Amino acid sequence: MVEKGKSRRNEVATREYTINLHRRLHGCTFKKMAPKAVKEIRKFAQKAMGTTDVRLDVKLNKAVWSRGIRSVPRRMRVRISRKRNDEEDAKDELYSIVTVAEVPPEGLTGLGTKIIEEED
């Protein structure tokens, strides 16, 4: 029997994911690729972390746009952190921040979802 109580969605957590942008952008007009990629990353983070407030790091935006509007990277390794919102007038108590994760020299093959332990 599963205990009712605190949901895992209300905890602070950090995870690393590989996002296949090529699959999500298939059939998209060339001149809309990079803006759509940013929207898809935001949508992925909302679904993965269960928060509606998603903030993208500047380095992530630069990585998406690094090869221009048409040539978006096929896959990206991202780190998504769910954090508490300290502002009193915030409508959500949690928000997610998405940053670029380091890609190992071997490439993205075989990397799954990785849970990062916080050092607070």
From Swiss-Prot:
Molecular-function GO terms, alphabetical: structural constituent of ribosome
GO cellular component: cytosolic large ribosomal subunit
Keywords from the UniProt entry: Ribonucleoprotein, Ribosomal protein
Protein family according to the UniProt entry: Belongs to the eukaryotic ribosomal protein eL31 family.
InterPro entries associated with the record: Ribosomal_eL31, Ribosomal_eL31_CS, Ribosomal_eL31_dom_sf
Primary gene name: RPL31
Protein name per Swiss-Prot or TrEMBL: Large ribosomal subunit protein eL31
GO biological process: cytoplasmic translation
